[in-house]
């Protein structure tokens, strides 16, 4: 058994309104059940999620956080505008985004964008993935899956890795519960984060910085799924999330 990870090269600088699926299909011949992995940065740019820092007016909460942390209140406001809960204010803002993803700065970024601008993440990554997937399937005539990725750090390790934030026609979790291990024991809790694993594999090719490649294709793995799927399946239920519970307890003490 083997699979391929293929970099889709020569993607131009993306601007608002660009037809990403057409640009991708011009550069690679897609096959049935390919998994197209797309960096959230170019999805956001195509959707027009770029804003001038100088045009952002901070509200009371942003000003209060800025006074405590010394950060730019305009950047804080940008993060708050895409957040539904703030857990940590410094040395970075750890938040849960409107889409349910818990990450640093709500994915708002000052890199890979012109000076003085901020790049917001897609508002609804699952919806973005669906639109891209439907258009890619229409152009190519193939059955395809899509993963939109972002780069995240890990709570207890140094370094970043690619993770899935939006999906189309692929289940984010593979449940091994009920299967048997090598010693005939029944697995009770094993759930494999397939979408994140694929995002991480693609990120090895996609890279970071000026030399980054924003699109890769995973070929040879059949994770195609006709069901309507959401990344919400990948997020731990609130009553089971002990880390969030702990962070909320710390907030109350402070």
From Swiss-Prot:
It holds the Pfam family F420_ligase. SUPFAM superfamilies: CofE-like (SSF144010). GTP binds at residues 11-14, 40-41, 45, 112, 206-213. It comes from the Archaea. Binds 2 divalent metal cations per subunit. The ions could be magnesium and/or manganese. GO terms for biological process: F420-0 metabolic process. It catalyses: oxidized coenzyme F420-0 + GTP + L-glutamate = oxidized coenzyme F420-1 + GDP + phosphate + H(+); oxidized coenzyme F420-1 + GTP + L-glutamate = oxidized coenzyme F420-2 + GDP + phosphate + H(+). Keywords: GTP-binding, Ligase, Magnesium, Manganese, Metal-binding, Nucleotide-binding, Potassium. PANTHER family: COENZYME F420:L-GLUTAMATE LIGASE (PTHR47917:SF1), PTHR47917. Catalyzes the GTP-dependent successive addition of two or more gamma-linked L-glutamates to the L-lactyl phosphodiester of 7,8-didemethyl-8-hydroxy-5-deazariboflavin (F420-0) to form coenzyme F420-0-glutamyl-glutamate (F420-2) or polyglutamated F420 derivatives. Belongs to the CofE family. This is Coenzyme F420:L-glutamate ligase. It comes from Methanosarcina acetivorans (strain ATCC 35395 / DSM 2834 / JCM 12185 / C2A).
